[in-house]
């Protein structure tokens, strides 16, 4: 359950059983996102009383369904905002870009195909080049060019702060 801590889970488990096996139970908190449906989830795992072997096994299972990382429990809610709510935030950008494409003259299906493949290309650049977004942005941004004009307009409208505020509100 979202927001339920190891301390709460451990307290519940130790109260509801008299078995000595549950005195120090192994507990995992796991938070995938909806992309697990297509084996592309970003999954967060936190462990309590688990051995490294148990942790490695769980990570390997969830890596079959996308990408899984071990995080401290204190980051679980932040991870949920970043990766789970993040799916909706990314889709909201995609929807806005599609609407912009239609305003530019493309049919909706064409605009969606263009935007989806453009976003996939951006993701592939980051993953394959092991680079950061700013480095990839710099490759396409020229002085006085259309890209910098568009980026500046997005920032004037509060794009970056809107994303950050949305993430913080989702914790």
Regions found by a protein language model. Give the residues of each.
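A short acidic, helix-capping loop that chelates divalent metal ions and anchors anionic groups
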Residues: 37-41, 78-80, 149
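ADP-ribose/adenylate-binding Rossmann-like module
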Residues: 1-5
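Active-site capping/gating segments
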Residues: 29-44
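NAD(P)-dependent Rossmann-like dehydrogenase/reductase catalytic/cofactor-binding core
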Residues: 116-171
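Internal alpha-helical scaffold of NAD(P)-dependent oxidoreductase catalytic cores
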Residues: 12-26, 42-78, 90-130
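Hydrophobic packing residues within well-ordered alpha-helices of enzyme cores
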Residues: 9-13, 150
């Amino acid at each position: 359950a979202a927001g339920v801590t190891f301390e709460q889970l451990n307290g519940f488990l130790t109260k509801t059983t008299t078995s000595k096996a549950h005195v120090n139970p192994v507990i995992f908190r796991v938070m995938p996102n909806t992309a697990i449906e297509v084996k592309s989830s970003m999954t967060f795992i936190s462990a309590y009383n688990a051995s490294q072997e148990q942790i490695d096994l769980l990570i390997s299972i969830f890596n079959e369904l996308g990408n899984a990382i071990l995080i401290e429990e204190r980051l679980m809610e932040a991870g949920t905002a970043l990766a789970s709510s993040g799916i909706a935030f990314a889709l909201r950008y995609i929807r806005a870009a599609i609407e912009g494409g239609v305003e530019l003259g493309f049919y909706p299906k064409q605009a969606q195909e263009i935007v989806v493949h453009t976003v996939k290309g951006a993701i592939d650049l980051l993953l394959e080049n092991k680079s950061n977004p700013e480095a990839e942005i710099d490759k396409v941004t020229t002085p006085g060019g259309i890209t910098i004009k568009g980026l500046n307009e997005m920032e004037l409208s509060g794009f970056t702060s809107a994303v950050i505020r949305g993430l913080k509100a989702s914790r």
